[in-house]
Amino acid sequence: MKLYSIETGNFKLDGGAMFGVVPKPLWEKTNPADSKNRIEMSARCLLIEDGDKLILVDAGLGDKQSETFFSHYSRSGDASLLNSLNSLGFNPNDITDVLFTHLHFDHCGGATKREGEKIVPVFKNARFYCSKSHWEWATVSPNPRERASFLQENLLPLMESGQLTLYDSDKDGVCPELGLDLLLVNGHTEKMALPKVKYQGKTILFASDLVPTAGHIPVPYLMGYDVRPLVTMDEKSRILKSAVEQNTLLFMQHDPYNEIVVLKDTEKGVRLDRGMSLKEAFES
């Protein structure tokens, strides 16, 4: 097995929205804001090469939305999903599977593209995997709070392509088609899936939006986007405590400075020990 960190380009979101009720003087110590109060965010994905499988976890924002849409998020950097794959010697047709942690636009937008008048999958040979409960949450009757993040042009073409697999998601377990252990959490959104990967004697948890940046490690530091913030607090407390006890590394999706973080227990609770690149985490 090999793991690769896939950069898809940075974007910005309002710092207040990203930290909810946490006062700015506290959160800007780790996530400095620009003149519009926005903080820098990565849209990092994880690529898992395992035998004849090439599994992509999430797909970034993509590029098919309008200039007006992207103007709200101040995208930056030269990285893109396809360029990052190409730099590793892969092309879109090599991807065998795509696992979505959830279906907010910054996690799944890069899985489809415009092709003439149609929107089609970028990865022609891949199966796309999503929790059945989360898919229904996002497509059948999306709630007013999340509707703007569930862009149907990102979602329905996947179903129409015949490449979508909806897995049963009532509890934590294994996605049998991929052989990945999944933690299912419900604070940020319904049935967000956090894959756990054992690699070179260590365990990595893809933190997704449970812990979007290292600045969000303290349990009360929650995003204003979470639909069930008290549930998020319970989930973070339990999962981060377990991560410390089991020496689990967190793969950071939205932290522009750290790909991997190591946690430690302190008198104030679980905190950041150190951050590093994926490569550094596995250097002997």
Regions found by a protein language model. Name each.
Residues 55-57, 99, 128, 204-206, ...:
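Residue-level marker for buried hydrophobic side chains located in beta-strands
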Residues 48-51, 195-200:
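Active-site beta-strand termini and strand-to-loop segments that position acidic
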Residues 8-9, 59-62, 103, 133-134, ...:
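Active-site metal-binding loops of divalent metal-dependent hydrolases
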Residues 76-90, 94-106, 122-184, 231-247:
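Metallo-beta-lactamase
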Residues 108-118, 262-263:
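Metal-dependent catalytic neighborhoods of phosphoester/phosphodiester hydrolases
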Residues 1-56, 61-65, 69-72, 170-171, ...:
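Zn-dependent metallo-beta-lactamase
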Residues 72-83, 200-284:
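Cap/insert and terminal regions of metallo-dependent hydrolase folds
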